[in-house]
């Protein structure tokens, strides 16, 4: 399963839609990769400069590795990301994601990774997860 977010339209009518990176599982011989597109081929996160130039109502406030979120073990699972997006105008936003209640499991003695989370913070300060 992949994680994706959609919301916003640029001046040409193109919609904002992107897959959200995560961590890949470890293998028998190496740690997993952090902040990568795991199950979607031919996709990547939009560069912040491109995102903000094309979609002027969107600001990427933070995009960083979520250190410690990958599962521990002989070889550690890759860490996910934190991506904080600020919509400067009212928008309808959709997100499709998984592993928010049940963590990614560990195999061959590895520990589970941390659950992901989605948080919507409204202008009023109300938070919805």
What are these regions (language model features)?
Residues 1-129:
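Glycine/proline-enriched, intrinsically flexible loops and inter-domain linkers
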């Amino acid at each position: 399963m992949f994680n994706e977010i959609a919301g916003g339209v640029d001046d040409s009518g193109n919609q904002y839609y992107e897959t959200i990176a995560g961590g890949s599982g470890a293998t028998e011989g190496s740690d997993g990769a952090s902040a990568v597109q795991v199950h979607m081929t031919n996709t990547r996160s939009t560069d912040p400069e491109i995102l903000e130039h094309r979609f002027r109502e969107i600001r990427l406030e933070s995009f960083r590795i979520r250190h410690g979120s990958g599962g521990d073990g002989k070889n550690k699972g890759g860490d996910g990301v934190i991506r904080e997006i600020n919509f400067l105008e009212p928008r309808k936003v959709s997100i499709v994601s998984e592993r928010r209640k049940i963590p990614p499991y560990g195999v061959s003695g590895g520990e589970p990774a941390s659950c992901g989370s989605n948080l919507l913070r409204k202008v009023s300060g109300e938070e919805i997860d």
